[in-house]
Every structure is written in C-alpha cells, then in structure tokens.
Amino acid sequence: MATGGKKSAGRTTGSGPAGGSRNLTVKVKTAKRRKLSSTLWLQRQLNDPYVHEAKRLGYRSRAAFKMIQLDERFHILKPGLRVVDLGAAPGGWTQVAVEKVGALKPKGGGKVVGMDILEWDPLPGAITLQGDFLADDAPDRLKEALGGPADVVLSDMAAPTTGHPSTDHLRIIGLVEVALHFALEVLTPGGTFVAKVFQGGTEKTLLDQLKKNFTTVRHAKPPASRQGSAETYVVATGFRGSSE
C-alpha cells in the first residue's frame, strides 16, 4: 500500500496515468545509511506514473487505480451501494468507493466503511475504523458501523512478506478465508466479494467455497498492479445468499 497525498475524494478520472506523463527515469543514489532495498523502493516510486497521477488527482495511494480498473471491468461499485473495505489504509480504495457509490450525497447515496490495523486519517464520506480485522470484536464493529447488510466486501489485506513464496501464499490465503467468512455473513443476495491473492490464485478448497456461494468467480490482475508483483485479485459476483 503505497502512500501518497491526503486530499479528499471528489474527482472523476480515467483508469491510468495521463498521456502527458514524462518518460523520464529518475535514479537515486544510495546514501550511506540507506539500505539498497530502500533506495530501490524510492527509485521505483519516483519513476512510477501511477504514483504521480495519484498525487495529481488527490488519491491517497496508487492502489486507487487498481480499484478503478477492476470496477471498469467488473462493474463492482454502483450508486447507492453499501461497501466494506478491509485493509483500507491509507484509503485509496475507500476514496474510489466513496466516489462510485455517491457516499457524499445527502440523499440516495451509498455507504462506505473501512478498517485497517494501521492508523489512518479520516476520509470524507466514509467511516474509517482502526483495528485488527482478526480481533474478535472486529466483525461486530464493522457491522455496527455499516448498520445493515453490505452489497460489496473488498479486501486488500496482505500479511508481511517473508520472501518464501509458499509461506506468503498461505498467509494471504488465510486472510482471504477470514474476509470471505465475514462477507458470507454480511453480503446481501447478489453481492460482490473482491480480495487480493498471490499468483497461483486461490486454494482449491477456497475456490470451491467461492463457487458454491457466488454465481461467477474470476481472477484479474489490473494494469496498475506492478509487473513484478505476485499479487492478483479474485472477484466473486452474484452472492447466492446465506444458507442459514
């Protein structure tokens, strides 16, 4: 989750950087006390057109463009919908959700509730909660803030990477499973669940559960997702409804 400017939502934009972006590459010298990994990260940020475009448009992170692109393809967010955003900080996805569902409208608008384990700044049009989603009280806090069923549950949660692909894959699948369990409790029939996974997709048991509860399950890697990143997203639409 890259950080960017902290302006509020309220703009319309396309799904990618403006055509006038500079084709210049910035090289960063490694300071004596700066690790090579930090230098490479800084250089990548400086040369990333999505980072520049996020700042220009007032999005808190480049991740906003991932949500915009997923929404353009799958039509996830619509006016009046109620959305839960898990792993929301610093708020890029939340900003897009606020815009798309019209959460700032005094009448007829949607509702957006976000939660992250990290502290994050309040966002106009959204209820921003700080807390560990794995904590026992987290689901109830989200349900109370939402005040009713959700139409969309988004999860951009990710565990710290270890550098060991199999371990990282299992960790993020665990987060997806917990997010899915919550989604099955709060989604209204016809609802949508979107979650970050790593390449290799979902485990068979998780995929079977998704297919059992949703009419359509697809994987997608939006253009704004870094080419070198192993992340991809599972998009499950058409929630069949609770079996209880």
UniProtKB/Swiss-Prot annotation:
Subcellular location(s) of the protein: Cytoplasm
Active site location: K196 (proton acceptor)
Superkingdom of origin: Bacteria
Residues annotated for S-adenosyl-L-methionine binding in this entry: G91, W93, D116, D132, D156
Primary localization: cytoplasm
EC number(s) recorded for this UniProt protein: 2.1.1.166
SUPFAM superfamilies for the chain: S-adenosyl-L-methionine-dependent methyltransferases
Reaction catalyzed: uridine(2552) in 23S rRNA + S-adenosyl-L-methionine = 2'-O-methyluridine(2552) in 23S rRNA + S-adenosyl-L-homocysteine + H(+)
GO MF terms, alphabetically ordered: rRNA (uridine-2'-O-)-methyltransferase activity
Protein's name according to its UniProt entry: Ribosomal RNA large subunit methyltransferase E
